[in-house]
């Protein structure tokens, strides 16, 4: 039996997703819980290995096991801190959560004070479609051509939410796009300059810096023909926890805004 699990976590409590020696990671926390529960498994895979500080509402992992207890989220949730399993689906044995994904949806949260949302929306149109995102990512050897399907921006409760959807993303790509939208909306980064950068015309020393990881949330990963059974109790528990913890991010983002604007003026 192969299962896909929807997981949420507070990324500020970990040193990233991927297991590393001597530090706490999301993958390490899940594997430890599986071991403590005595659940034997194989072929463990993840959809997205988020960076340190980045949280998730809807990341997905998959594993193969004959232990039916995996279908009860509380078996692992009771053994983990800062990670919550809230959805499960039985999937084909060759299912890979990263390669089978249609799109990923990220949300970034910013304090709305001083934000020109109308201008941010205008700037966001420049990123739609297929471009070279080397100026808006931390290059790691992968092909830098990527496609953005959708960007939506709205304000709610004194917070600006930037939602970005696409097939796949480069390292720090979403966070750097958010930085560019903020700078563009405030007149620091011209739209013409963004177009040039998306065509590969930029100085490496003048790349747009990434927004802080604490404001980024991997909201969802979409699949065809994969129906997750939702555990509402686990989902609500995560939602309560993350709202309290994200309150701190508002002050961090305000500090980031001051720093990035001053950096551009130096």
Swiss-Prot record:
It catalyses: uridine(38/39/40) in tRNA = pseudouridine(38/39/40) in tRNA. The keyword Isomerase applies. Pfam families: PseudoU_synth_1 (PF01416). This is tRNA pseudouridine synthase A. CDD domains: PseudoU_synth_TruA_Archea (cd02866). The active site is at residue 51. It comes from Pyrococcus furiosus (strain ATCC 43587 / DSM 3638 / JCM 8422 / Vc1). Substrate binds at residue 106. PANTHER family: PSEUDOURIDYLATE SYNTHASE (PTHR11142), TRNA PSEUDOURIDINE SYNTHASE-LIKE 1 (PTHR11142:SF0). Its EC number is 5.4.99.12. Transmembrane segments: none annotated. One of its GO terms (molecular function) is RNA binding. It comes from the Archaea. Belongs to the tRNA pseudouridine synthase TruA family. Coiled coil: none annotated. GO terms for biological process: tRNA pseudouridine synthesis. Formation of pseudouridine at positions 38, 39 and 40 in the anticodon stem and loop of transfer RNAs. InterPro entries: PsdUridine_synth_cat_dom_sf, PsdUridine_synth_TruA, PsdUridine_synth_TruA_a/b_dom, PsdUridine_synth_TruA_C, TruA/RsuA/RluB/E/F_N.
């Amino acid at each position: 039996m192969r299962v896909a699990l929807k997981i949420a976590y507070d990324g500020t409590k970990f040193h990233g997703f991927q297991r590393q020696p001597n530090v706490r990671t999301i993958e390490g926390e899940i594997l430890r819980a599986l071991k403590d529960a005595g659940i034997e498994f194989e072929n463990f895979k993840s959809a997205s290995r988020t960076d340190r500080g980045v949280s998730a509402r809807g990341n997905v992992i998959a594993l193969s096991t004959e232990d039916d207890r995996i279908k009860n989220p509380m078996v692992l949730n009771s053994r983990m801190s800062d990670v919550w399993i809230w959805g499960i689906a039985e999937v084909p044995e060759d299912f890979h959560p990263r390669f089978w994904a249609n799109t990923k949806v990220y949300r970034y949260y910013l304090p709305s004070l001083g934000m020109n949302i109308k201008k941010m929306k205008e700037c966001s149109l420049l990123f739609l479609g297929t471009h070279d995102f080397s100026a808006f990512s931390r290059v790691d050897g992968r092909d830098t051509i990527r496609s953005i399907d959708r960007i939506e921006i709205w304000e709610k409760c004194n917070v600006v939410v930037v939602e970005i959807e696409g097939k796949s993303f480069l390292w720090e790509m979403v966070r750097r796009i958010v930085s560019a939208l903020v700078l563009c909306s405030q007149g620091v980064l011209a739209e013409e300059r963004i177009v040039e950068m998306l065509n590969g015309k930029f100085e490496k020393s003048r790349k747009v810096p990434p927004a802080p990881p604490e404001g980024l949330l991997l909201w969802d990963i979409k699949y065809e023909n994969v129906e997750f059974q939702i555990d509402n109790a686990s989902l609500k528990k995560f939602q309560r926890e993350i709202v309290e913890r994200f309150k701190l991010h508002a002050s961090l983002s305000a500090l980031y805004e001051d720093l990035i604007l001053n950096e551009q003026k130096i």
